[in-house]
A protein has these predicted regions:
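Repeated loop/turn-to-beta-strand initiation elements of outer-membrane beta-barrel proteins
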Residues: 45-47, 83-87, 153-156, 183-188, ...
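Transmembrane beta-barrel outer-membrane domains
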Residues: 24-30, 67-70, 137-139, 166-172, ...
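Outer membrane beta-barrel
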Residues: 1-11, 20-162, 169-171, 178-185
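Outer-membrane beta-barrel "beta-signal"
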Residues: 314-326
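Outer-membrane beta-barrel architecture
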Residues: 34-36, 76-78, 145-147, 176-178, ...
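Transmembrane beta-barrel strands of outer-membrane/channel proteins
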Residues: 3-9, 51-53, 90, 158-160, ...
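Detector for outer-membrane/organellar transmembrane beta-barrel domains
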Residues: 174-287
Length: 326
């Protein structure tokens, strides 16, 4: 068994809302636990499986939110071979991998500006509405994926998620190329989601908040370069949405740095999104934080995030947290 527990204490104010002081989970990373295994089949082949589920340590409940499934992080079986790996089940999407690898706050749903713009940017939230983000979850149900072997740092993968229905709803596909070479890394991702008003992948966030939304295509590029004294991050994303009567697009960019400072790391990131043909909104989000390792598996952190959507009051989030891996 393996996983991590992340808890933070602080205050959060979404754009257009009021400040709430809270003890909550997943400040820097969402808490989860997992099981995995492999069986050697001979001749370079292995049978593999992974089961991973999120939980909320602040109240002892499973899932990221009420209604989330038990193994919403990953749940799959597969075959590894010299020719690549094939897996089937609920799989982490290529876009999520690209999003978290090329921003300094990685997968934080509390302090990462890029995660805000990608996964908290489409729909009606408690205090604001926006049409700029990506539909669906960080994982796809009913999915099949092929991942190539690594060729001198270069790898590619393709995924298709069946809708398990006679209609077009929830059918999705994506492809990704990743490259790692010394201090340099890069990625390119494309994903397409075709659905009937609701993508069916994110429980309480199921509704897109945009009536008549039929399909969405997303392309994202990411790069990073580690200069030792500073690591640079950059991302660009183009999102195209097809609605029943019209369409609109969104341009998103993110730049960030992580700087070693003492035994820990200073992180800073800024993301900007602007849409055309939809709500005609602009969104600017910036964050700064410091992560301090207490041991190889435990760290503490402090961070602040500023979030502004045009024509709404700004949001602010700040807090300190503890993360322990096991």
């Amino acid at each position: 068994m393996y996983g991590q527990v992340d808890e933070w204490v602080g205050a959060q104010k979404f754009p257009g809302g009021k400040t709430a002081v809270q003890v909550s989970g997943g400040g820097m990373s969402t808490s989860y636990w997992g099981l995995k295994g492999a069986e050697d089949l001979g001749n370079g082949y292995k049978a593999i499986f992974t089961l991973e589920g999120f939980f909320r340590a602040q109240n002892g409940q499973y899932g990221r939110f009420t209604g989330d499934t038990t193994f919403s992080r990953n749940a799959y079986v597969g075959i590894e071979s010299p020719y690549g790996t094939v897996t089937a089940g609920r799989l982490t999407t290529h876009l999520f991998v690209s999003t978290i690898l090329f921003n300094p706050f990685i997968d934080s749903y509390v302090f990462s500006p890029m995660v805000y713009h990608v996964y908290l940017g489409l729909g009606t939230f408690p205090t604001y509405s926006t049409d700029q983000g990506v539909t669906g979850d960080s994982g796809w149900n009913n999915a099949v994926q092929y991942q190539s072997p690594n060729f001198n740092g270069l790898s590619a993968s393709a995924m298709y998620a069946l809708g398990n229905t006679t209609q077009n709803g929830a059918k999705k596909w994506s492809g990704q190329v990743l490259y790692f070479h010394g201090p340099f890394a890069a990625t390119a991702v494309y994903q397409y989601v075709n659905f009937n008003n609701s993508p069916g992948d994110l429980g309480s966030f199921d509704s897109s908040g945009v009536p008549g939304l039929k399909a969405q295509s997303v392309a994202q590029l990411g790069v990073s370069y580690d200069l030792k004294y500073v690591k640079l991050f950059g991302q660009y994303m183009y999102t195209h949405n097809d609605q029943t009567l019209t369409s609109w697009h969104v341009n998103t960019a993110q730049g960030g740095v992580s700087v070693p400072f003492g035994p820990g790391t200073v992180m800073a990131s800024y993301a900007y999104s602007r849409d055309g043909g939809g709500f005609d909104q602009t969104r600017q989000t910036a964050a700064v934080g410091y992560d301090y390792p207490l041991s190889r598996r435990t760290d503490i952190y402090a961070a602040y995030l500023y979030d502004h959507i045009s024509n709404q009051s700004s949001g602010n989030t700040y807090g300190v947290g503890l993360r322990a891996k096991f």
